[in-house]
Swiss-Prot record:
One of its GO terms (molecular function) is phosphatidylserine binding. Annexin repeats lie at residues 161-232, 233-304, 315-388, 392-462. The keyword Calcium applies. The keyword Hydrolase does not apply. The gene is nxnA. This is Annexin A7. GO terms for cellular component: cytoplasm; endosome membrane; nucleus; phagocytic vesicle; plasma membrane; vesicle membrane.
Length: 462
C-alpha cells in the first residue's frame, strides 16, 4: 500500500523538490530545516519501528527505517523517557518508504507475549538495503544539497549506473521502425528511482525529447502503464493514483486506503501539496466529496500526522486497549470516534502493542476480529488495514499483491502500483508472500500476466 507534518514541523531541507534535484519547482515551497541524512549508524537493539506481535504465517520482518524526528501529535503527551519495558517484543521494521535514517539509542524491549494465534517472531533488522544517507562521495548526477537516497520522504536509492549510457540504450530501443522492448525492460526494471530520474534528464538533454512521452508513443497497455509508473516521481504517482480512484462513477476506496495507511508524515505532506497544486483542490476536500460518515472522518484523519515515535508507553497501551474494548465489544453499539482517534493518531509500534494487549485481556481474540464484528463496509476495511499494517507491513503488501491476482482476472492497476512503489522492499515482500500463500510471487505473476508486461514485472521483483 511514505510526510512532513501539518503542524509544528518545519519543511524538509536537502531533499529534492518536485521536478528537479535541489531546485524547487514552481509552486512547491523549498524544504528547509532538515539536515542531510548522513552518518546514522543502523539502529542497534531497537530495530526500526516494529516487531509488534507478529501475525501467523508472516516471515521474519526486515526493517524499515524508523519514522522518527517528529514530536508526538497535539493532544498526546510525548512518549519519551520510559525505561526499557518488559513485556513488549523488539520493535522493528517498516519499509524504507518512510524517509528517515535509522536512529540509535533505544534499548531493546523484550518479553511481550504474542497475540493468540500469532507465533513470536522477533523480526531481525533490515538486510540488503544500502545505508541511508551515507554516500562515499556524491554520486554523478546528484545536485548539491540533495539528500542521497531520499526524495520527498520516499526511498529512491543512489546513482551507481551510467545514466547517460542508459539514455542512449533507450533512445536506440525506440528509434526507427519497431521497439526493442527487451532493452526497455533491461534498463528501467533494473534501476532505482534516482537513476531513472537521471536517465530522464540525460535523455532530455541529449535528444531534446521527453522520455515518458516517447515511452507512451512506442508502447501500450499495461506494459506502458508500468513503464510510465517507473518513471514518475513517487509522490506524484501517489497523487495520480488517489485522483484516479476518485474519478468517474464510484470511488475506489481500497486504493485510497492502501496509500493513506502506508505513507509516512513526510510523504503525506508532499502528497497534499502536490495534489492541491496539480488539481486545484485540497486532498481533504476531494476525499470529503467522495466519502461520507465515519469513513470520511477516517480518511480525513489519515491525511493528518500521526505519532511516529518508536518509544512505547505501556500505560497508554493498556488504556488504549481498554478504551477500544469499551468503545466496541464492551458496550451496546459502537463508538466509532474512539477507534478512529486511537488508530489514526498513535504510532504503528504502539498500535501493534495495543493489539497484543487487547487479545490478552478482552475476549481472547484479536483486535482485528473485534473490528470485523463491530464495523462494516469501507470503515471496517480501513481500520483493519491500519492494524494489519502495524502488525506486519511486508505481509500487508504481500496480501495486496495476492488480492490483485486472485480470482477471475487481474487488478492490473493494484498490481502495478504495489510492485512499483515497493520494489525496494521486494526481498522481504516475496518472503512474506511465499510464507502466506501456496505459490511464490513470481509464480503467480507468471500465471496471471502475459507478454512484455509479465517480463517487466518479473524483472522488477527479481
Amino acid at each position: 500500500m511514505s510526510y512532513p507534518p501539518n503542524q509544528g514541523y518545519p519543511p524538509q531541507s536537502n531533499s529534492p523538490q518536485p521536478g528537479q534535484y535541489g531546485a524547487p519547482q514552481q509552486g512547491y515551497p523549498p524544504q528547509q530545516g532538515y539536515p542531510p541524512q548522513q552518518g546514522y549508524p543502523p539502529q542497534q537493539g531497537y530495530p526500526p519501528q516494529q516487531g509488534y506481535p507478529p501475525q501467523q504465517g508472516y516471515p521474519p520482518q526486515q526493517g524499515y527505517p524508523p519514522q522518527q524526528g517528529y514530536p508526538p501529535q497535539q493532544g498526546y503527551p510525548p512518549q519519551q523517557g520510559y525505561p526499557p519495558q518488559q513485556g513488549y517484543p523488539p520493535q522493528q521494521g517498516y519499509p524504507p518508504q518512510q524517509g528517515y535514517p535509522p536512529q540509535q539509542g533505544y534499548p531493546p524491549q523484550q518479553g511481550y507475549p504474542p497475540q493468540q494465534g500469532y507465533p513470536p517472531q522477533g523480526y531481525p533488522p533490515q538486510q540488503g538495503y544500502p545505508p541511508v544517507g551515507v554516500p562515499v562521495g556524491v554520486p554523478v548526477g546528484f545536485a548539491p544539497g540533495m539528500v542521497v537516497g531520499y526524495h520527498q520522504g520516499y526511498f529512491v536509492g543512489t546513482i551507481t549506473h551510467d545514466c547517460k549510457h542508459d539514455a542512449e540504450v533507450l533512445r536506440k530501443a525506440m528509434k526507427g521502425i519497431g521497439t526493442n522492448e527487451s532493452d526497455l525492460i533491461k534498463v528501467l526494471a533494473n534501476r532505482n528511482w534516482a537513476e531513472r530520474e537521471q536517465i530522464k534528464r540525460e535523455f532530455s538533454a541529449k535528444y531534446s525529447k521527453d522520455l515518458i512521452q516517447d515511452i507512451k508513443s512506442e508502447t501500450s497497455g499495461n506494459f506502458e502503464k508500468c513503464l510510465v509508473a517507473l518513471l514518475t516521481e513517487p509522490a506524484h504517482f501517489d497523487v495520480e493514483q488517489i485522483h484516479s480512484a476518485c474519478a468517474g462513477a464510484g470511488t475506489n476506496e481500497n486504493t485510497i486506503i492502501e496509500i493513506l495507511v502506508t505513507r509516512s508524515n513526510v510523504q503525506m505532506e508532499y502528497i497534499k501539496q502536490i495534489f492541491k497544486n496539480k488539481h486545484g483542490k485540497s486532498l481533504k476536500d476531494r476525499l470529503e466529496s467522495e466519502a461520507s460518515g465515519d469513513f470520511k472522518k477516517l480518511l480525513e484523519k489519515l491525511t493528518e500526522p500521526r505519532d511516529e515515535s518508536p518509544v512505547i508507553n505501556p500505560m497508554q497501551v493498556s488504556k488504549d486497549a481498554e478504551d477500544l474494548y469499551k468503545a466496541g465489544e464492551g458496550k451496546i453499539g459502537t463508538d466509532e470516534k474512539e477507534f478512529i482517534k486511537i488508530l489514526t493518531s498513535r504510532s504503528l509500534p504502539h498500535i501493534a502493542a495495543v493489539a497484543s494487549e487487547y487479545i490478552k485481556h478482552h475476549k481472547k481474540h484479536s483486535l482485528i476480529k473485534a473490528i470485523d464484528s463491530e464495523f462494516s463496509g469501507s470503515i471496517k476495511t480501513g481500520l483493519i488495514a491500519i492494524v494489519t499494517y502495524a502488525l506486519n507491513p511486508y505481509g500487508y503488501f504481500a496480501e495486496i499483491l495476492n488480492k490483485s491476482m486472485k480470482g477471475a482476472g487481474t487488478n492490473d492497476n493494484k498490481l502495478i502500483r504495489t510492485v512499483v512503489t515497493q520494489m525496494h522492499n521486494m526481498p522481504q515482500i516475496k518472503t512474506a508472500y511465499s510464507t502466506l500463500f501456496k505459490n511464490s510471487l513470481a509464480h503467480d505473476i507468471q500465471a496471471d500476466c502475459s507478454g512484455d508486461f509479465k517480463k517487466l514485472l518479473l524483472d522488477i521483483i527479481s
